[in-house]
Swiss-Prot record:
Protein known as: Pup--protein ligase
Pfam families found in the cross-reference section: Pup_ligase (PF03136)
Extra remark: The reaction mechanism probably proceeds via the activation of Pup by phosphorylation of its C-terminal glutamate, which is then subject to nucleophilic attack by the substrate lysine, resulting in an isopeptide bond and the release of phosphate as a good leaving group.
Family assignment from sequence similarity: Belongs to the Pup ligase/Pup deamidase family. Pup-conjugating enzyme subfamily.
Disulfide bond positions: none
GO MF annotations in UniProt: ATP binding; ligase activity, forming carbon-nitrogen bonds; magnesium ion binding; ubiquitin-like protein transferase activity
InterPro entries linked: Pup_ligase, Pup_ligase/deamidase
Catalytic residues (positions): 57 (proton acceptor)
Organism: Streptosporangium roseum (strain ATCC 12428 / DSM 43021 / JCM 3005 / KCTC 9067 / NCIMB 10171 / NRRL 2505 / NI 9100)
Function recorded in the entry: Catalyzes the covalent attachment of the prokaryotic ubiquitin-like protein modifier Pup to the proteasomal substrate proteins, thereby targeting them for proteasomal degradation. This tagging system is termed pupylation. The ligation reaction involves the side-chain carboxylate of the C-terminal glutamate of Pup and the side-chain amino group of a substrate lysine.
Keywords for this protein: ATP-binding, Ligase, Magnesium, Metal-binding, Nucleotide-binding, Ubl conjugation pathway
EC number(s) on file: 6.3.1.19
Length: 452
């Protein structure tokens, strides 16, 4: 697929610290956060003018699903716009708390685990053709996804019975099977529930739920960009070495616990390979593929960063990607802090630092303090991110949804939308079904808007 639809869903962790007598449960905090959303959307599950979906997921986790994007830079921009929208809700909720005499700070974390060991996710969505063999897609992808964390994990200090260890991935400890149709009870690597949110005869949505939520724009670009290249190779029939893993779930944990990328995991054919070797195999195939087929600026940037990250892991010279890869940026931050205060990795102060990296409040979050200092690389500009808070992507179906919502709100019309339906709740109950996510112009939608 030369042009692909991408989407990211990020669940956020919520917590509140109180200085007064009155304390709020996570549910109550989430209600404060979403009060403004409910006041204009009459629900805690809404679609926004930029085409995105914002809702309260199970366990009081706010979730932001980007609109459909057809290039990775735009996807990163819209994911960051989601952070800004949630930061706005947070500031608003804190103000409301103060007005009601409750002394407390609300924190929103874009991470994947809380202190109680619960996990919540970052789900990646890739549109693929219906005609391909989904089983083969999964077979080729799983070894890539299991080892991909070495280049795009978010990093985490994990407390184990043998002491604290630094892992490259947050999500790895919480994945229990390779391919499954459940997302919460048993967390698989690829979710197979068949909901294409598009014409089911033509398309299928590949739902990858193994990845970490990224603060770094460049890590996010690499995560989705490299996965897209691997998908394109599979779709083009590129012959790949069989790297199927004997036990993907054991392998994912082993890879996560090894910052050197050298620990060997067992393949289904009895041989062994390290995460570095497996990633290098996919990278060299992807490089050949782009050389043969030609690639755009984004794919060249992805390949360059992918290679440099593997080089950094292999040589142990993490400075090579300290400005671009989440787990490395965070690791170096923690190590500097530990040296300065002579702390063990198991120190509660280190755990606090680990968490503060993911705080989306720009005046408080450690990632944003690094960004303000110019210590991390960017993909999107602040202006583009600000625009993306209210303007949908212009080349996908999101444009139709965003325009419809904007007009209906301006005209104060009652409406219902989801990923494929646009409906005016008037006597005629006029509905337009948008089954092609690539289509950004549709006379039926224009007519629906004109008739408001």
């Amino acid at each position: 697929m030369d042009r692909r639809i991408f989407g990211l869903e990020n669940e956020y962790g919520v917590t509140c610290t109180f200085r007064g007598q009155r304390r709020l449960s996570p549910d109550e905090v989430a209600r404060y956060l979403f009060r403004r959303v409910v006041s204009w959307g009459r629900s805690s599950n809404v679609f926004l003018r930029n085409g995105a979906r914002l809702y309260l997921d199970v366990g009081s986790h706010p979730e932001y699903a980007t609109p459909e994007c057809d290039n990775v830079v735009e996807l990163v921009t819209h994911d960051k716009a989601g952070e800004r929208i949630l930061e706005g809700l947070l500031v608003d909720a804190e103000k409301r708390l103060r007005e009601e005499g409750i002394a407390g700070d609300i924190y929103l974390f874009k991470n994947n685990t809380d202190s109680a060991g619960n996990s919540y996710g970052c789900h990646e969505n890739y549109l693929v053709g219906r005609h391909g063999e989904f089983g083969r897609l999964a077979d080729v992808l799983i070894p890539f996804l299991v080892t991909r964390q070495i280049v795009c994990g978010a990093g985490k200090v994990l407390q184990t019975p043998r002491g604290a260890v630094y892992c490259v991935s947050q999500r790895a400890e919480h994945i229990w099977e390779g391919v499954s149709s459940a997302t919460t009870r048993s967390r698989p690597i690829i979710n197979t529930r068949d909901e294409p949110h598009a014409d089911a005869e033509r398309f299928r949505r590949l739902h990858v739920i193994v990845g970490d939520s990224n603060m770094s724009e460049t890590t996010m670009l690499l995560k989705v960009g490299a996965t897209d290249l691997v998908l394109r190779m599979i779709e083009a029939g590129t012959v790949m070495r069989d790297l199927s893993l004997e036990n993907p779930i054991r392998a994912i944990r082993e890879v996560s616990h090894d910052m050197t990328g050298r620990r060997r995991v067992r393949l289904a054919n009895g041989r062994e390979a390290s995460s570095l070797e497996i990633q290098q195999e996919y990278l060299s195939k992807a490089r050949d593929f782009v050389d043969r087929r030609g690639g755009d600026e984004i794919s060249h940037r992805v390949l360059e960063l992918w290679e440099r990250t593997l080089n950094a892991v292999e040589t142990g010279n993490l400075d090579l990607v300290a400005r671009e890869i989440d787990w490395v940026t965070k690791y170096q931050l923690i190590e500097r802090y530990r040296k300065k205060y002579d702390l063990p990795l198991s120190s509660p102060r280190v755990a606090q630092l680990d968490l503060a990296y993911h705080d989306v409040h720009r005046r408080r979050g450690l990632f944003y303090l690094l960004q303000k200092r110019g210590a991390v690389e960017r993909v999107a500009s602040d202006l583009k991110i600000f625009e993306a808070k209210s303007v949908p992507p212009q080349t996908t179906r999101a444009r139709l949804r965003g325009e419809f919502i904007r007009k209906a709100q301006e005209k104060r019309r009652d409406f219902t939308v989801d990923w494929v339906h646009l409906k005016l709740n008037d006597q005629a109950q006029r509905t337009v079904l948008c089954k092609d996510p690539f289509r950004s112009v549709d006379e039926r939608v224009d007519k629906l808007i004109a008739g408001m």
